[in-house]
């Protein structure tokens, strides 16, 4: 299965229009949204940018509702639980806009998750660290897909306040204290950590390149072969890279 992955949007509503053109052109099987639709150090004071972004997200969700998996980023959670979960760039004047937009996404029949797996690939906003290798079930020599089920189910059923930690899939950044979880030789795809170009950290591919100076590349991953293709905003395939 070939999956188009949309990383951090941060009020750049045009990304949904380009993603739509990519889907119309290349007919990929599925779309995964990695979260962080909102907040921006550039556009964050502009409530109209919030409205346009949530409108575009709701439109995209409706069009691809049968072929889409939607994930939360830390910035969405900060609007769902403003009392306990906060992050930089938050605009409290946009709370109603963001929550109404999230409701519209759910109203087309979508569940918004924190983590998911498709084929041999695990998707989350920031990456799943090997902090989660401590789950007792993983010591029972499970089949890879069973282990991925245990991990993603545990994450998706954890309270947001308990995910407000550096090692969680909402906040994780690559480091040598907690390496990326690699149960069953999985590949991980995540955003959150800005980089000019996508890059591998062990088995984790970080694709948050949509910021000034970034390469602005969408990612397409084959969940069976692990082949990765990058597509720019003009719909050109830029280069391919496979996981070792």
Model segments located where?
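Active-site environment of divalent metal-dependent phosphoester hydrolases
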Residues: 10-17, 39-42, 75-82, 129-131, ...
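C-terminal regions of proteins
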Residues: 228-243
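Active-site-proximal loop/helix segment associated with metal-binding centers of metalloenzymes
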Residues: 89-101, 112-182
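Conserved beta-sheet core of the metallophosphoesterase superfamily
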Residues: 170-231
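Core catalytic region of metal-dependent phosphoesterases/phosphodiesterases
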Residues: 6, 11-97
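Active-site neighborhood of phospho(di)ester-bond hydrolases with catalytic His/Asp-centered motifs
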Residues: 5-7, 31-36, 69-74, 123-124, ...
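Beta-strand-turn-beta hairpins that frame and shape the catalytic cleft
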Residues: 1-4, 116-123, 201-203
């Amino acid at each position: 299965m070939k999956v188009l992955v949309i990383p951090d949007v941060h009020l750049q509503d045009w990304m949904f229009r380009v993603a739509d053109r990519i889907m119309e052109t290349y007919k990929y099987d599925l779309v995964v949204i990695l979260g962080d639709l909102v907040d921006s150090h550039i556009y964050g004071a502009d409530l109209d940018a919030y409205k346009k972004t949530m409108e575009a997200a709701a439109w995209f969700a409706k069009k691809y509702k049968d072929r889409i998996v939607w994930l939360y980023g830390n910035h969405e959670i900060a609007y769902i639980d403003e009392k306990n979960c906060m992050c930089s760039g938050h605009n409290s004047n946009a709370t109603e806009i963001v929550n109404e937009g999230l409701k519209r996404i759910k109203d087309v029949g979508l569940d918004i998750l924190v983590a998911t797996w498709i084929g041999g690939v695990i998707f989350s906003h920031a990456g799943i660290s090997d902090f989660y290798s401590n789950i007792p079930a993983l010591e029972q020599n499970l089949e890879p897909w069973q282990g991925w089920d245990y991990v993603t189910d545990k994450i998706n059923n954890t309270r947001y306040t308990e995910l407000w930690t550096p090692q969680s899939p909402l906040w994780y950044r690559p480091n040598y204290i907690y390496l990326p979880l690699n149960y069953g030789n999985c590949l991980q795809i995540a955003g959150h950590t800005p980089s000019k170009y996508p890059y591998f950290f062990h088995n984790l591919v970080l694709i948050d390149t949509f910021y000034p100076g970034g390469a602005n590349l969408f990612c397409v991953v084959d969940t069976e072969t692990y082949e990765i293709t990058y597509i720019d905003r003009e719909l050109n395939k830029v280069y391919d890279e496979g996981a070792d």
